[in-house]
From Swiss-Prot:
Residues 124-138 have a biased composition (Pro residues). It catalyses: L-seryl-[protein] + ATP = O-phospho-L-seryl-[protein] + ADP + H(+); L-threonyl-[protein] + ATP = O-phospho-L-threonyl-[protein] + ADP + H(+). It comes from Dictyostelium discoideum (Social amoeba). This is Probable serine/threonine-protein kinase DDB_G0279405. CDD domains: STKc_LKB1_CaMKK (cd14008).
Amino acid sequence: MGCIFTKPSPEQQKFDGEDYECENKKNLNLISYIRNLLFGNNSHQQLYNEIIPTTTSTTSTTTNSVYQNIGLDGYNNNNNNNNNNNNNNNIMNNYGYDDYGYSYEEDEDYYDEMPIPTIVAQPQPQPQPQPQPQPQPQQPIRIVSQNQQIPTTPPQQISQFNITGNKSPSSIGSRHRSKPKETLRAHKKRHKDGHKMVNEYVFVRKLGKGTFGKVKLAYHHDTHHLYAIKIFNKIRLKKQTMGIGRPNAFDDVLKEIAIMKKMNHINVVKLYEVINDPQEEYIYIVMEYIEGGSIMSANETSEDLARKYFRDIVFGLEYLHEQKVIHKDLKPENLLVNSEGVVKITDFGVSHIFDDDDVVRCSRGSPAFLAPELCRNESQPISGKGVDVWALGVSLYCLIFARTPFISKTNSLLDIYDQIVNHEPTYPREISNDLMDLFKRLLDKNPLTRIQIAEIKSHKWTTISGTWPMNELDHLILSVTDQEMIDAISTDHTIKPSDNTTTDEDDSDLSSSSGGESSGIIGSSNESKSMYNNVNSKQKIQNQNQNQNQNQNQNQNQNQNQNHNQNQNQNQNQNNNNNSLIEKSNISIPASSSSISNNDSCYENRNVYIKDEEMNMICNDSVIMDPIKELNKIDGLNYGCDFQIGKEYSDFQYNSGHFIYDLVDENESQISRESANDYYLPFKTNKYLNNKSIV
């Protein structure tokens, strides 16, 4: 370049214009640009544009819009070129704010956004085209502050003309990845700019909501890498039941963590860290941030781009099935695309882990994506792999036509089920014959003849008539056992809840917990055979300390035992009343939804007597309560038992029916006779037991 410059003195903080001489003054702007890259200046973008003018509209779109469309409005520079973004593949236009939804009950917390500091990621000149290397494990996106400006090469733009140039991801499906980190301390503080922090993560904004929690965008204070962090209130998770056979929603979180810990594939979202402080109410799941958002857009997608996305999904889905995981909620909202056009599967909250066969027994998932066999009122084994393949076909249909194939005319679930079971999809526009054939095989209503993953990989449309083959997977099969699900987080399993666990303030998940008695939230223990044992032992100790109070109730116990005997005799007649209960519930669900797993149990040494409004016994279980066996005969009921230790109230929850029930302790002393109408009943435990734990 022919430039000579003097070295700055130690006390100088930046280059001065007089410290260098340039033989060719045309290079002055370039030197200034380099100087500002190193030491910072607000005019760096203007200098960059002067030195490296836009040569084509495509290059301009890629350079100027990448950093404005990574899902960070507050991280844009002053040159707002959103209106000039002509990227036809819609990768950068999908911000993904609402695409981190997942299958837990909605948390009503609303994020109190603070002003976001200006953080600039400076692009550098595009290098000369080089042969495309073997794909490498993707690193988290990196952002930098004004005081630390680091050039970043813009991601490669994916278009309909170069998508076949990407190498198959199957060859790196087994690449080495460090084990996700587990942290048992959550140190909460404020960043110097006012943003909330947990450990080294600085929270920026909320990306989306799900059931029981939210997802926030954060960056690592030291590395400036971006992450998506799921935040859950463990008390709320523990208190909520998700249906018959499911004790609480915390199991779903444990299962998702266990599955993500095992996953190591380019087309599956990565888990980096789990922060689970036993003294805090919240658990934080640090995941890979996918800046492009959902693959779904408001516009129809070309077959070429849809094929590229579809192949990525097939690779990821094949990997999940090889790992004995059924996703069960495959849909565009759970298929995220990064800036390089790579699709990644996320949200394993309702996923199913199978051992010898892939049979699923419930229809948890989005109704519009349910397979016909899940919508029929039949009791037969259902292949989980076939369910995922059907959802794959519906997702491809959404990509091509920007709508779902089965739409209810009355906004009724039953109408959607009828459309799925009894009607064929329509095709709004002309598509290729190969794609039409693939749709017919993906959306085959007979699960026995529906196309399988191996056939999808060799289909003419997927491979462009064999010119773009999909290679075989090369990876190590890793199974997820039930014990690994229980041990997904290994902590001391009690926390100190806040005074009000139902607060709607968003600060609650990022502020220190107040003092209080243990709420009995359980993770797992290597010595535990059940995730509830620790709470059980504590309850037994508390029960022993309450013997004096219990002795005062002996007379009442004798009367109660007589009532129990009468109730047990009435229980023999309960089957005759089941139909009337179903009619009262006004709930109509597929038979597959009421299939029960027998691994559900509540806490030890507790009896719950539940009667209907005519005082007929519904269930009477003790020692290790398993009312599911009794309620299995009553289709549509959602029985829940979850009472927190030392809390002012807890939830006794139903989804249908009207009941009067007696709640008793392990000595069969009557605690209360209450009525439950439909969905929700707050039950005051302190009033009856003086902080004694009950379930």
